[in-house]
Amino acid sequence: MVDLLSRNLYSGPRVYIRELLQNGLDAIEARSALDPDCPRRVTITIEGRTLKCRDSGIGLTEEEAAGLLSTIGASSKRDELGMARSDFLGQFGIGMLSCFMISDSITVYSRSAKSANSPTVIWQGKTEGTYTTQPLGPGDPHNLGEPGTEVVLEAHPGEPWIDPDTVRALVDEFASL
């Protein structure tokens, strides 16, 4: 079902980069409402078939990750973050589905900026519609040192949309919009 939705909502796999960038920028906008001096960055790295997109945005609590990432159509881009919906690039909370066009799973590590002691949480979703959410323990190597979110995709074997030159071109294209 998730795979079917992701393939029918988007014009093609290339939009996954746009959606990752858009989510990162929106998260930074939300964090800047709490902390105008917060760092503002979105980085994408590729190692083999693994793509990581890291932002310095507001991050998610365990409850937010379970509710927002696991419900098609859910979105944090609502007034509860203190921002009018029109302040965000993405509106519908379905952008993450585009990642399933290049990967069978999505792993999200996130640490909320709403509390100084927020733990890093991990959310893992799969194309068959299953997911898990849990906080990471203090010694876990995936703990984020600062608030924000890291999305990790393990691309399908031979997936052309993970090629570093292709990703760089897509970032350049979508960053100019």
Give residue spans per PLM region:
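Phosphate/anion-contacting hairpin/loop surfaces
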Residues: 171
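Charged, low-complexity intrinsically disordered tails
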Residues: 163-168
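GHKL (Bergerat-fold) ATPase N-terminal catalytic module, capturing the glycine-rich phosphate-binding loop
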Residues: 1-161
